[in-house]
Amino acid sequence: IDSNNFKAINDKYGHPIGDEVLRETALRLKASTRQNDFVARLSGDEFAIVLKSVHQVEHLISIAENLIKCCAEPLIYKDHVVQFSFSIGIAIAKEATSPEDLIAQADQAMYKAKTLKHHWFIYHS
């Protein structure tokens, strides 16, 4: 998961609001996942979610749609209304040869999603 407009937010509003967007993104992602799923900030404006016990692609798509919706509402911070969005790349562990390969597949899908449309997800296949 990678922000679509984080640099623009930092440039327009400053780093304190950018930091708040990162915190709010983490909170919203965690609130949009199940208790046994793992949400982590990898670096900068990039996050990862490890979903356990997902057996159907349709369920995965439903989860991704919920994640997209979680940031539909803007962040209200002091006197600022900040719209933010992200793109999601999806990869399946059983289709990867290693954890690094899994992340590379998810990154590949995420960057494809970024080129197609902001606020979108792509499944690596």
Question: Residues of each region from the PLM?
Answer:
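Active-site flanking residues adjacent to catalytic metal/cofactor-binding acidic residues
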Residues: I1
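Catalytic core regions of nucleotide second-messenger enzymes
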Residues: R41-L42, C71-F86, K114
